[in-house]
Regions:
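Intrinsically disordered, low-complexity, charged terminal extensions of DNA damage-control enzymes
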Residues: 1-128
Length: 128
């Protein structure tokens, strides 16, 4: 039988060659792993969470990830941010990660794939 399908939007916030990652709650999928934030409204999230305005927003093709009980369609939204405000220093459960550096911990597989794709875009290459 067909597995149920769930959908989510993930923000791939990029600033100064780094991407914003959050540690997921211990319970639930990818418990305790680092991931891109799942959001409802991207612009709102940028303003509230990053205290920043998105300069450029790009919607990527949906990425499907299969779990044993359901499929998850991830809609990645790449958001370029001009400057990282002091409000979002690295906290225990969020960090600015530079691809190529040692990761802060375990990273969810589809997130790792998205980071690799991002690493090959001009957004991140120009800073290396």
């Amino acid at each position: 039988k067909e597995k149920p399908l769930r959908e989510t939007t993930m923000v791939l916030a990029v600033a100064d060659g780094a991407v914003y990652l959050e540690r997921r709650p211990a319970s639930g999928i990818w418990g305790g792993l680092w991931s891109f934030p799942e959001v409802g409204d991207v612009g709102e999230w940028c303003a509230e969470q990053l205290n920043a305005e998105a300069i450029a927003v790009e919607n990527w093709d949906t990425l499907r990830h299969s779990f044993s009980h359901y499929d998850l369609d991830i809609a990645p939204v790449v958001v370029r941010i001009d400057a990282v405000s002091s409000k979002v220093a690295d906290y225990d459960d969020s960090t600015w990660y530079r691809p190529g550096d040692a990761p802060p911990g375990g990273i969810a597989a589809p997130v790792m794939r998205l980071i690799e794709t991002l690493s090959n875009t001009d957004e991140l290459r120009n800073h290396g």
